[in-house]
Amino acid sequence: MRVNDSPSDEVYQTRLQGAQTAMKRAGIDVLALSGPDFHNYFAGLWGLPVGRPVWFVLQQYGKPAFVAPRSEAREISARCKTPVAVEWVEWEGPIAAPMTNQDALAQYTRGIAPNPGLIGLDFNCTSGANVELVRQALGAEHIKDVTPMLQELWACKDAAGIAAIRQSCDIVREQFLACRNAIAPGIPEWKVTLASVTAAIERNGELLAEDEELPRFWPHQLNMVGSGADRTARCHPSGGGRIMQDGAIAQICLCGQTFRGHAACFDRPVPIGSKPLPANLRKVIDVAREAQSAALAALRPGVTAGEIHAAAVAVIKRSGWEAPFLHRTGRGIGYSDWDGIELKAGSQTVLEVGNVLSIEPGVYVQGIGGARFGDTVLVSETGYEVLTPFDLGRNI
């Protein structure tokens, strides 16, 4: 497909059929999903700048529909082919209409399934308040969390998903180059973030070409920058006002949904200026890089997520720091910023061909600093393929 094309109707139909098969197996009569990542996965709807609930509704048989606020109905129709079946409003008009999202969802659900057994919600993406409102409207005994079912459904990426993830990786490459060019002594961190955001918008503009609807930037594109011993020893400083100093590093974290809602991960430490790095900081960097290499060496179909994490941890523990860990070794990404897999201690999740993962072990030592090398990796028949530019920024 051309880079600015959405997946074909056949791709969405295959995904819907997969969901309907899973629903029958789990005894779910109706799905009602509020998570934007699921809207994108099943219908190609992405980038609505709205906080009001939008529900994607699917039965075991038949076609899906949206239940949405009237403010977004036209926007949804412009961005995807799935119709809006019921609109809810926030004013009284001559024609009666539901005035809350839960009443609109209940009206539509009862119309298509008068006696539903179980209605599946994505609890992980739906606020607790909205879950409770839906329980009140449809009966708590009918509501079930189907987050695990959905995460299993999209754990292995299809060809269209992998193609879009590759474009996200292309964008983070441009972001990193822009970040590296902006890093210099005397410059505030936020200017590096500005360079990254601008690069992402420009590259999205090139890839999406003439498409009128899809946003070129979305807030779920993380452009995190932290410099110096204290800020890099925390894993997620975010482009503040700190002035970068010669002889230190800036840790760049480019994780997020950069292209049509598809996520990538790319992390690199970048030296600031021309002064040599302190030996103890150099050790942090070297160990972080070696830990990622160890995790990759263990990666192949059939191993568990916990085994990948253990390979990275073994390298870091040998270095003798007392408490250098702040996070897991990685996670499943691609259709969202977290697709359900966790590369963490004890995880028995067996990795499969088609999983897309972040491999990003980090080392964080207070008083010295932190470093992380992160890449987006596809599990393949022969082991893995790194989708991000692996050699870029690796040797520092």
UniProtKB/Swiss-Prot annotation:
UniProt keyword annotations, A-Z: Plasmid
Domain of life assignment: Bacteria
CDD domains: APP_MetAP
DNA-binding is among the record's keywords: no
Keyword Glycoprotein annotated: no
InterPro entries according to UniProt: Creatin/AminoP/Spt16_N, Creatinase/aminopeptidase-like, Creatinase_N, Pept_M24, Peptidase_M24B
The family this protein is said to belong to: Belongs to the peptidase M24B family.
Name used for this protein in its record: Agropine synthesis cyclase
Organism: Rhizobium rhizogenes (Agrobacterium rhizogenes)
Organism lineage: Bacteria, Pseudomonadati, Pseudomonadota, Alphaproteobacteria, Hyphomicrobiales
Gene it is expressed from: ags
